[in-house]
From Swiss-Prot:
It is a single-pass type I membrane protein. Receptor for transcobalamin saturated with cobalamin (TCbl). Plays an important role in cobalamin uptake. Plasma membrane protein that is expressed on follicular dendritic cells (FDC) and mediates interaction with germinal center B cells. Functions as a costimulator to promote B cell responses to antigenic stimuli; promotes B cell differentiation and proliferation. Germinal center-B (GC-B) cells differentiate into memory B-cells and plasma cells (PC) through interaction with T-cells and follicular dendritic cells (FDC). CD320 augments the proliferation of PC precursors generated by IL-10. Ca(2+) 1 binds at W69, D72, D74, D76, D82, E83. The chain crosses the membrane at residues 213-233. Keywords: Cell membrane, Disulfide bond, Glycoprotein, Growth factor, Membrane, Metal-binding, Repeat, Signal, Transmembrane, Transmembrane helix. SMART domains: LDLa (SM00192). InterPro entries: LDL_receptor-like_sf, LDLR, LDLR_class-A_CS, LDrepeatLR_classA_rpt. The keyword ATP-binding does not apply. GO terms for molecular function: calcium ion binding; cargo receptor activity; cobalamin binding; growth factor activity. This is CD320 antigen.
Amino acid sequence: MARCGAGRAAALGLVLRLLLGLRTGPEAAPAPTSAPAHTLVQVSGPRAGSCPTDTFKCLTSGYCVPLSWRCDGDRDCSDGSDEEECRIEPCAQNRQCQPQPALPCSCDNISGCSAGSDKNLNCSRSPCQEGELRCILDDVCIPHTWRCDGHPDCPDSSDELSCDTDTETDKIFQEENATTSMSSMIVEKETSFRNVTVASAGHPSRNPNAYGVIAAAGVLSAILVSATILILLRLRGQGYLPPTGLLVAVKESLLLSERKTSLI
């Protein structure tokens, strides 16, 4: 009995399956499942030169990116063409090239700002000090001696321009001035020394020591003359000298004292 019940149940299940298959038909058969294929399709977009005016066309891919993304420091195109040649042509959305952020509008006599906005700046330059010169393209003052010294001191190197014809002339002129100045100083010193010497000799009152020398010379001469006369008189009294010899000796002593005085 148990076996008959199991056989009937199996037969009933087979019949039910056949009936379900007939009702659904081949259309209800489940299709084999498969993962959808995600392929990157490169959209060619508009043809070359047909991007909107407010966009930038990537060179390789042809994609159009907003013009504000151009030269913003971020590579938006796959080939990085939106970040190329940014120092040459950093243009804004209205296609008017603006100065770089690192180089703001300045008073350099060059129209680098849009709509001439640099003309509205306060571009009055303060004058350079005496002995200085101003660089041509930069508001920088440097000493005049730095001109044509073989080393560019101006940011634009304008202090070393046109030095082929001026350098030798400037050097010769400076050397001649230096030589003339040295000669003048030497002549002035020699002249001053001579004037001081002559003035000291011609005007004893300007040299206090001259009085002492003259007084000492006069006293010494008087002592010598007096001593000579006393000696000669003593010798004469002892009979050693004739009268004529006394006169000659006195005369010679006087002449000797005068010579000594003139030498002093």
